[in-house]
């Protein structure tokens, strides 16, 4: 069994490389997802993903679509590395003499991976959401100011233009949260993140493993890279849509600023109840299409890098098929 021991540094490097490539490719869609999910029954700014991206480019420029990307690019390496390496570790610990895992054990390994990753995922998402949603809130304030000016033209008192709110930075947000709420401020929404990421991993990893196994050659060699990519895309999109209701609740809970006439929430159940009462069941699927488009290539790329064993090649280590 010693010759099958997992090389943790290689898994961490593979996860980091995959995360950096994936985030760079799909981050604008993730921004659209966050803004669509945060829209309530107040001032609705966007009607679809494409409408959101077009309006973002017009009002904030091309790089506005990458607002918050620096946080993701910084923390996605440990986040994806922990997720993939933890799943590999738990699968290794649960296996017996190289025998194929049962579905229950595959789900158990995925559960462990999802639980481990929230250490990094929660503060990363907390900061990213504030930066991504700042543009939507600024656009709302601009529209409200314009409407106030138009209504003020017929009144005796002149309207006052709303002052521009400075855009927050990740460093400023981190400092303010630590000062006002301590480390718990960065982990707001931890429970909701667990309720999203643990079921996601329970669905994703067993589904990927079985889909990838279908493409394995009869000779017993590892699956071709394109099979790993397609398996990652299918498993990722399926798991993403399945847990999208929890992602909507998590996004709402982690948003510190609210738009015009938007609800505030005291916890997961309160948020879910208000969404259901005020917006209907369909609100839990807001951003599901965007999330599937984000997760599919993100995990497809991750599994290609992971299963090709790029880090093992760089480090001169033998490639071990998990």
Curated annotation (Swiss-Prot):
PROSITE patterns: SOLCAR (PS50920). It is found in: Mitochondrion inner membrane. The keyword Mitochondrion applies. It catalyses: L-glutamate(in) + H(+)(in) = L-glutamate(out) + H(+)(out). Its main location: mitochondrion. It is a multi-pass membrane protein. InterPro entries: Mit_carrier, Mito_Solute_Carrier, Mitochondrial_sb/sol_carrier, Mt_carrier_dom_sf. Solcar repeats lie at residues 6-93, 101-214, 223-312. One of its GO terms (biological process) is aspartate transmembrane transport. The keyword Transferase does not apply. Pfam families: Mito_carr. SUPFAM superfamilies: Mitochondrial carrier (SSF103506). GO terms for molecular function: amino acid:proton symporter activity; L-aspartate transmembrane transporter activity; L-glutamate transmembrane transporter activity. The chain crosses the membrane at residues 12-32, 62-82, 107-127, 189-209, 223-243, 292-312. GO terms for cellular component: mitochondrial inner membrane. Keywords: Membrane, Mitochondrion, Mitochondrion inner membrane, Repeat, Symport, Transmembrane, Transmembrane helix, Transport. It comes from the Eukaryota. Belongs to the mitochondrial carrier (TC 2.A.29) family. Mitochondrial glutamate/H(+) symporter. Responsible for the transport of glutamate from the cytosol into the mitochondrial matrix with the concomitant import of a proton. Plays a role in the control of glucose-stimulated insulin secretion. This is Mitochondrial glutamate carrier 1. The lineage of its organism: Eukaryota, Metazoa, Chordata, Craniata, Vertebrata.
